[in-house]
Regions:
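N-proximal low-complexity "stem/linker" segments adjacent to membrane-targeting elements
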Residues: 49-164
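Membrane-embedded multi-pass helical conduit in multi-pass membrane proteins
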Residues: 87-114, 126-129, 135-139, 408-501, ...
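Cell-envelope/extracellular polymer assembly enzymes that use nucleotide-activated donors
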Residues: 143-147, 176, 337
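Short, acidic, metal-binding catalytic loop of nucleotide-sugar glycosyltransferases
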Residues: 162-174
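A conserved acidic beta->alpha catalytic loop
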Residues: 181-189, 204-206
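Long helical/loop segments within the catalytic core of UDP-sugar-dependent glycosyltransferases
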Residues: 201-236, 250-333, 343-344, 361, ...
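The conserved acidic donor/metal-binding loop of glycosyltransferases
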Residues: 242-247
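Catalytic donor-sugar/metal-binding loop of nucleotide-sugar-dependent glycosyltransferases
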Residues: 330, 339-357
Length: 623
């Protein structure tokens, strides 16, 4: 058989495959166009494109009231003014001509400091508003359902507790409870029937197990799409969704449904409080404390025209609005894409700060890494797909708002990398980029941070953090912040590779229970060991060859910090594994023995850098 003969059948097969894909896409497009009453013009793998201009909807003024008292507003304005003074003073001091050594060094360092110092701006703008839904607003009487999703890897006992809490809501009107289960067992069917809970499953339905959006397999979007297409749109005005592990408080449903009395509101976001396992997981506590201001005052500040973001699958939707956008958005971050599509279509969002559902945070550090990687990859991937096709539909304020969200992860990764590379490069080269007094630098820079600390303490005192008791400062918060960024950077890189080479992406559901036998993969400690080694070597080279004392000190300081991170991650894994398994520390050591050795190995070059530094300092300063 000749080469041309072997090629011909493959070519015909590929053409037939493309015809099938095109035919399937056309059918789906017609279905979503019909569902949205013509608003979905066409669909792409990245999401829908709308045919009609956005709706002109605005919430009624009577829907919202201010959260803060007049006195608190004055105090917050005073703190904001102090921050502005500290910010201005820092930059006036920093840009003094006497600090300039090289334009390149000053420019690069200034860009990094500008990013770090302006992060507080957006937070200050958001918390200056804090409009909350009026508590006296009457709960509307609607056809209502509350639904929870469950994957096969999620324990039935956990889902059952959530369903029981859903049934026990203090709500003035009738509502239905649904379980959207990927693979319900006979036991689940029997229990749900006895409790009056309805079950939806797409198991064995190929049309709802597609490889890409819409109705994607192994994804909450596809699971919920089956429910909405068969019952949600036709039988209910509002549907409230929950993650399997998030057990709602008794007033959860009332708080989420209340804003829907305003016809302009298409969705209601709620706080994502992942503290159910906070006592047994430092990673869960770290994320919980890091995100407490976000899930409270920051989200609340975006209510009423600034698009609060749905986080997790716990939010409420007006089914008419969801039909309007063609259903839930694509990707792992369906919460964010759905929020974005609602706003692209012109619907308003509210934030129910008092709707509390307590769920699970990451069980282990490995789970935390998986989540950080997947979330950053998903959010960055949107910059290449759906987002640019809708941005022109948004008002300027929302374009700025969503742009800030989308660039958060890339800027976080770049800033962290730059913060490590700059002192190392200066130390090795011996080039002093700027000439400043370091104590003066620390004092002027951290004056801005002190203002933000006062603000967070005020917000915590007013009960606005979620959870209320989250500390403003803690060692878990510090460790989480330092440990997460390498995986965020890896997720950003993964998104770029994924979109450049059109590689398929797969999602991993993190475990919802722990046996204590989980092994800490050594690859999760390697980045910190690499950072410690690189900074220590840079410090030693600088001590042997150059006069850049300040940068050598920064290298040693950074190496010490990441040495603590690597060791702490390993030791804490052993401690938590022993507690979960009910064994002795010696027995649990096997779960992190190799990572601990990898974390300890870089202490040798670090010890050398620390040992040499005093004599190096005296020699350079001529003491």
């Amino acid at each position: 058989m000749t080469h041309s003969q072997t090629e011909a059948p493959q070519h015909r097969g590929s053409r037939q495959g493309r015809k099938f894909d095109d035919r399937e896409r056309q059918i789906l497009e017609l279905q979503l166009r019909d569902l949205s009453d013509g608003n979905v013009g066409r669909i792409t793998p990245h999401g829908p494109l709308f045919a009609r201009p956005p709706r002109s909807l605005q919430a009624e003024r009577s829907t919202y009231v201010s959260t803060l008292s007049g006195r608190d507003k004055v105090i917050m304005a005073g703190i904001a003014a102090l921050w502005a003074v500290a910010f201005s003073w820092f930059w006036l001091w920093w840009l003094q001509p006497g600090h300039l050594v090289s334009w390149v060094g000053m420019g690069v360092t200034s860009v990094l400091l500008l990013y770090l110092s302006t992060q507080a701006c957006y937070f200050l703008i958001a918390v200056a508003r804090l409009p909350r839904v009026r508590p006296s607003l009457k709960i509307p009487r609607l056809r209502l359902a509350i639904a929870v999703t469950r994957a096969p890897s999620e324990p039935w006992a956990m889902a059952r507790r959530t369903l029981e809490a859903m049934k026990a809501q203090e709500f003035p009107y009738a509502y239905d409870v649904w379980l959207c289960d990927e693979d319900p067992s006979p036991e689940i069917y029997e229990w749900c029937a006895a409790q009056g809970i309805r079950v939806s499953t797409r198991k064995g339905v190929p049309e709802y197990n597609r490889s890409s959006w819409p109705r994607r397999t192994k994804c909450k979007e596809g699971n919920l799409a089956y429910f909405y297409d068969h019952w949600g749109y036709s039988q209910y005005d509002v549907v409230v969704q929950l993650d399997c592990d998030h057990e709602p408080s008794s007033t959860y449903l009332a708080e989420v449904v209340r804003p829907f009395s305003d016809e302009a509101i298409g969705y209601v976001a709620a706080p994502s409080i992942c503290d159910a396992n906070a006592r047994t997981s430092w990673a869960a506590r770290g994320r919980l404390y890091r995100e407490a201001p976000f899930h409270g005052p920051f989200q609340l500040g975006h209510a009423n025209r600034l698009a609060p973001v749905c986080i997790g699958s716990h939010y409420g939707v007006r089914t008419r609005a969801l039909r309007d956008i063609g259903g839930l958005g694509p990707d792992l971050a369906e919460d964010f894409t759905t929020t974005f599509l609602f706003n692209s279509a012109g619907w308003q969002g509210a934030f129910a700060i008092d709707a509390e559902a307590h769920g699970l945070g990451p069980m282990t550090f490995a789970d935390m890494v998986t989540q950080e990687y997947q979330w950053s990859r998903s959010l960055v991937a949107m910059m290449f797909g759906m987002i640019p096709r809708h941005m022109h539909r948004l008002p300027v304020r929302l374009r700025i708002r969503f742009t800030i969200v989308l660039i958060y992860y890339p800027l976080l990764a770049l800033a962290a990398i730059a913060g490590l590379v700059l002192p190392a490069a200066a130390s090795i080269s011996g080039n002093i980029w700027v000439s400043v007094n370091y104590l003066a630098f620390l004092g002027n820079f951290f004056a801005m941070g002190l203002c933000m600390l006062f603000l967070l303490l005020l917000l915590r005192r007013r009960g606005l953090l979620r959870p209320h008791s989250a500390p403003v400062l803690s060692w878990e918060l510090w460790l989480f912040t330092l440990a997460r960024w390498p995986w965020v950077a890896w997720g950003v890189l993964g998104a770029i590779v994924q979109e450049t080479f059109r590689r398929p992406i797969y999602f991993k559901v993190t475990p919802k229970d722990r046996s204590g036998s989980e092994v800490l993969p050594k690859r999760l400690v390697l980045p910190y060991g690499g950072i410690v080694t690189a900074l220590s070597v840079a410090a030693v080279v600088g001590e042997m060859t150059g006069p850049a004392v300040g940068y050598v000190f920064l290298c040693i300081l950074g190496a010490c910090a990441y040495a603590v991170v690597g060791i702490a991650v390993s030791v804490l894994h052993v401690l938590e594994a022993a507690k979960a398994a009910g064994t002795r520390l010696r027995s649990a050591m096997i779960t992190a023995r190799t990572p601990l050795l990898l974390a300890l190995a870089p202490l040798l070059p670090l010890a050398l850098a620390i040992y040499v530094f005093p004599s190096y300092l005296f020699a350079v300063l001529g003491w």
